[in-house]
Amino acid sequence: MNSPLRGIWLWLPLLLTWLTPEVSSSWWYMGATGGSARVMCDNVPGLVSSQRQLCHRHPDVMRAIGLGVTEWTSECQYQFRQHRWNCNTLDRDHSLFGRVLLRSSRESAFVYAISSAGVVFAITRACSQGEVKSCSCDPKKMGSGKDSKGVFDWGGCSDNIDYGIKFARAFVDAKERKGKDARALMNLHNNRAGRKSVKRFLKQECKCHGVSGSCSLRTCWLAMADFRKTGDYLWRKYNGAIQVVMNQDGTGFTVANERFKKPTKNDLVYFENSPDYCIRDRETGSLGTAGRVCNLTSRGMDSCEVMCCGRGYDTSHVTRMIKCGCKFHWCCAVRCQDCLEALDVHTCKAPKNADWTSPT
């Protein structure tokens, strides 16, 4: 091989590394990695050195994070259940979502936020349940306190959300902090918005003590709300996400359109418009909507017109078993009958383009 060609071949792997976009949060794959924490730490691809160090030092926290992946991906799928892109995950893909999140879109903003929130939630819950050696209940919630109802004593186990946020920041943001590009700044912003969203729904719960429930004495603690509240909140932020561009010195954002308000730390931000997700597309990672169930009577995103992108739909007649004729029997059971229900199911037609059958 002559010298110029040989030089090109030597540089080719490095050029491909520079030019190929990468989904940063390979730690998402921790939920799919079985075995011990050590096996998980060594086999999740793409972790930076500080993430691997935290992984080996805190195997109990990593187990919590791994279990939490299932929870936040399920919440993502719930929020997008009626949309063309439904937060579907890919088996044996360490990025979990494939090429879809390479684009700096609203969907990427939401996934980074909900995943960061999921880590905070999972770690904080594990602390309260005594599953993490390095943390427990919130040590600051001791002694007495006061609210609109009067004085109370801190007791029980207040969720140590500050520990969850601190660990999540150190672990999740580690790879983004190594990068100085626009996408890294976008991810860091949305990660922070996700962490803050969990703390927003921290609520005070109390138990009354006293003669005949007089509540002359109260014991209170702080508890995280159900993760659905965080998911609903971030969904609203997704719908109000703000498109931005990098400022001139490359240190932050400015709005892409002067009509938009400046994003706060609680807002989600994105750079690129989303694809329509109508058809399978190798470049964008879209799986398309062929075969998706649609709602014939809806006028929303789940309608057959919108979901199927104007391609039409097929209708199949199916029967399913449901509970019916339920009656309450004293005391204390509800008994139901099993009934067959006939219904029509509408699914989106595939495009006529033969390329549809090609795998992504």
UniProtKB/Swiss-Prot annotation:
Disulfide bonds: C76-C87, C127-C135, C137-C157, C206-C220, C208-C215, C278-C309, C294-C304, C308-C348, C324-C339, C326-C336, C331-C332
Glycosylation sites (chain numbering): N295
Keywords: Developmental protein, Disulfide bond, Extracellular matrix, Glycoprotein, Lipoprotein, Secreted, Signal, Wnt signaling pathway
One GO biological process term: lung induction
Gene Ontology molecular function: cytokine activity; frizzled binding
Domain of life: Eukaryota
Localisation: Secreted, Extracellular space, Extracellular matrix; Secreted
Modification comment: Palmitoleoylation is required for efficient binding to frizzled receptors. Depalmitoleoylation leads to Wnt signaling pathway inhibition.
Any one Gene Ontology cellular component term annotated for this protein: cytoplasm
Signal peptide limits: 1-25
Covalently lipidated residues, kind O-palmitoleoyl serine: S212
Gene3D superfamilies, A to Z: 3.30.2460.20
PROSITE patterns: WNT1
Family: Belongs to the Wnt family.
Family matches, as PANTHER family: PROTEIN WNT-2 (PTHR12027:SF86), WNT RELATED (PTHR12027)
Function statement: Ligand for members of the frizzled family of seven transmembrane receptors. Functions in the canonical Wnt signaling pathway that results in activation of transcription factors of the TCF/LEF family. Functions as a upstream regulator of FGF10 expression. Plays an important role in embryonic lung development. May contribute to embryonic brain development by regulating the proliferation of dopaminergic precursors and neurons.
Protein name as annotated: Protein Wnt-2
